Amino acid sequence: MPDIAIEVVYALPEKQYLYNVKVPQGSSVEQAIIASGLLQLRPEIDLQENKVGIFSRPVKLHDEVNGGDRVEIYRPLIADPKDLRRQRAERAAKK
């Protein structure tokens, strides 16, 4: 099968990682991430814990990638979005 070109991205507050990778057609999201070498560079990434997506759409590790896809590895949330909204609303009400 021919190779397809995809991107694998992972963003931290201080640095963004973007790798252009060629993988065989029919490869899974997990195979694409492994082929990028990002797991060796950032050992804190745990594919069983971190969610993944393609163009901001959540996908499973076994889903197939297509040419031109951008595979994204998401970091876990550090705060509950509902709590943050509540805190912002309280601060705005005090002003």
Curated annotation (Swiss-Prot):
Listed Gene3D superfamilies: RnfH-like (3.10.20.280)
InterPro entries listed in its UniProt record: Mopterin_synth/thiamin_S_b (IPR016155), RnfH (IPR005346), RnfH_sf (IPR037021)
High-level lineage: Bacteria, Pseudomonadati, Pseudomonadota, Gammaproteobacteria, Enterobacterales
Organism the protein comes from: Erwinia tasmaniensis (strain DSM 17950 / CFBP 7177 / CIP 109463 / NCPPB 4357 / Et1/99)
Similarity-based family: Belongs to the UPF0125 (RnfH) family.
Protein's name in the database: Protein RnfH
